[in-house]
Amino acid sequence: MTEIKEIDTIPDEPTADRPENRRKKRQTTPFLKPRDGLLIAFFVPVLVMICIFVQRGIFPFGERCFLRTDMYHQYAPFFSEFQYKLRTGGSLLYSWDVGMGVNFAALYAYYLASPLNWLILLCPKKFIIEFMTIMIVLKIGLSGLSFAWYLKKHSQNCILGVGFFGIFYALSGYMAAYSWNIMWLDCILLFPLIVYGLERLVKEQKGMLYCVTLGLSILSNYYISIMTCLFLVLYFIALLIMEKPGPVRKYVDSCVRFGIYSLLSGGLAAGILLPEIYALQSTASGDFDFPKAWSSYFPIFDMIARHIGNVETEIGLDHWPNIYCGVAVFLFFLLYLACKKIAVKEKAVYCGLLLIFFASFSINALNFIWHGFHYPNSLPCRQSFIYIFLMLFICFRAYMYLDETPKKHIAIAFWGSACFVLLAEKLVTQEHFHFIVYYVAIIFLAAYAGLMYLYKDGKRTVCGFLALTLVAIEASINMSVTSVTTTSRESYTSDNEEVRILKDSLQPASDFYRVEKKTRKTKNDGAWMNFPSVSLFSSTANADLSKFFKKLGCESSTNAYSITGSTPFVDSIFSVKYALYSEAVSNTELMMYLRESCGTYLYENLYTLPLGFVLSSDIEENWQYEMDNPAEVQNDLCLVSGADEVLVDAGGTVNKNTFTFTPDEMGEYYVFVMNKKVKTVKAELPTGQKSFSNVDRGYLLELGTLAPGTEVKLTADEAGEQLNAIAYRFSEDAMIQVYDRLNQSPMHLTSWKDTKLSGTVSAAKAGMLFTSIPFDKGWTVKVDGEKVETRKAFGAFLAIDVSAGDHVIDFSYFPKGLKTGGLISGGSIVILILLWFLRREMERREARKRMEQIRNMQQEAEDDPDEEPEFEEIPDLDDEDLTDTINNRKATTEEQL
């Protein structure tokens, strides 16, 4: 079989004139060899990150840990729940430990789908944070390696320089800003492989690498993969433009191949992807609102200036892209434009792609499209890693022709770059830019230009070592200055052992229960410590449940809801039977102390409603739960149930930004702030001062137990806003009344597992069996062995209609879309395998055909030794024409077969 050599994506001059073939000794030192480029691209970023961790005192080098933003609040708890399920044999389809009960298959797909995450099974529970940290460092190193490997495929020979560019890809401004976002990193490290796979698909008609790597990227994180897929469409068009013109059939075939393998890659991930898509439709992000008017956030000059190193990264609500990838890009980009060895068509295409990204960073509508037809809630320009990839590749192309670059071009590039930096100091007004960064950038530019001059003067022995040192220093300084913020590991894990002991003491449980920590570290403490809980902070949060929480006076937002603001009545409805306190509190008629472990206290709520109970059929019509005041909503449910109001008006006086009231009797007090412009409130209590943040989210402010006769004063931080508020005292007697009314026909569970519930209910009369299970179409309910239709109660919960009498109820859960997605994935795998075998068979047939031709020619020569064999005249072709000829003949052979 004839071996087809690797084809460079970018059309170059004949092999003999290749720049890399004229500099085999470039950057070779006793310490560094050209083949070391790949090792450098992996190990230097890893060592840089380890050094930064040592300097920051990150465990085991100190008491700190690398838990930043979502890694603190979401990733660590979800990793803990994932590990817990793997070790205990729990279902990966549903979890009661997160937000009242969630579709864990969707949560897994969104946060945990990286295949590397399964290694957590080998990690001790107490080192989950360190497992995540190690995975981040490993993925950063692999990102550098994959990009260097991609560049190596374009240089034909091992050259040390691929390692330098790999370092900047791994330690770019994007990584500095988002390296903590472990669920994105798989897509970053796979991206160079995907792009190379697409190039092979277009050049060599081989789609296996493209399909598998893109499928793995989509599986690992669908969100970043949306941006990858959008770019692949653009890059596919770019590759066709850079191809040598051919017949229309050639372009049609390429488009068909691209479409088939792209669909197959999505199909490979469908088993994970479809349940996630269905779940996301029930989130607040499920809405679609394309911008009505187009606008620009900032000028292109300011964006380009963010290539300067040591500039503070942007992860907030501003839209600035994090695009730093070494200040040398200023030099190399100008050298790229000036290089006569690089085709004008190529320059036009790649510069066009860069302009598209600049427009996407700055124009609101394009920003909306790139982020999956949504505006990002902080963490801007999440597609900027693609821009960095393009910019570094462009610069590498200039680097490949450094031998042919005149010294005057280097001088012009340096002075042009230096002038831009000085101009940026004058024009850029962002607070991210400290004045010193401009001068540091010029120093590094001068150092890079000096190295180029040394190289051009023939002093190449030390150039490789000096270049590596300079690149490592620049990248590490930027990473150290702009990245790796830390928090206290001790404070995050301080009470873990105590909580574990107390929650384990509740097992085995005879009936369903939920637990809440009154002093939480995150809204996902249940997932972190593996106990059934109520609160949740996740992008997969159910929007209807968030709205219902707010109606009852609990804290909620776009992607979170929590028990903050709940009354004992709300706790009872949500089956919160146990509470964990960080300090001892007195027993009441409603709550009883159970046990304590090293300063953590476990209490039982004595009047907790079961997971399900029968309500009258007309309660949804009678209960006015759409009112603005959550206290009135709770009281109305009491009245509808035939009980007294649980929240009694305690009066109070409003005076500008203050609200005061005096308790008339001992009890637990709450305040509801009606002015939504007030965000922060300070309460002066007999026990001291208490602060409340995010008050505009509409939750009840819990003031605790207050004695009569002592004035309580609340003050809004917003001095110009009037603190319109109402104070309430919680009535324990009314609570017992309403509990007795609602608990007349409870559901008693006989079995309780992740995806299956069984129980009995004795309904005094026909009604609605309400459950505090969030509504999900994945639930199937059977009554007395017969499947019944489920419905959404109060806009958020799972319910069914039951007749009077005794019934056996069975619940089972299977995520919507999982079966269909699994079938699609299985079918895609089969098709991909068939395509692989088909291609191998075609190549074998072609090889056999050629061998047969050779044997025939040999036989003819033996039969008539005097006759000279005739050979087909082969035209004189250059590398590019030869490549096209081979590819066209292979395509023709495939069509015939």
Spell out what each predicted region is:
Residues 205, 224, 348-368, 374-498, ...:
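Contiguous transmembrane helix-bundle modules in multi-pass membrane proteins
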Residues 45, 136-154, 158-243, 254-277, ...:
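Membrane-embedded helix bundles of polyisoprenyl
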Residues 69, 73-86, 115, 254-257, ...:
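Periplasmic/ER-lumenal interhelical loops and adjacent helix-loop junctions
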Residues 30-32, 78, 639-872, 894-897:
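Active-site-proximal, structured, solvent-exposed surfaces of multi-pass membrane proteins
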Residues 24-102, 487-527:
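Hydrophobic alpha-helical membrane-insertion signals
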Residues 1-58, 253, 257, 457-467, ...:
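Start-transfer (signal-anchor) and selected internal transmembrane alpha helices
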Residues 470-490, 504-574, 607-610, 614-636, ...:
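Extracytoplasmic/lumenal acceptor-recognition loop(s) of multi-pass membrane glycoenzymes
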Residues 55-155, 159-192, 216-220, 311-319:
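Active-site lumenal/periplasmic loops and adjacent helix-entry segments of GT-C-fold
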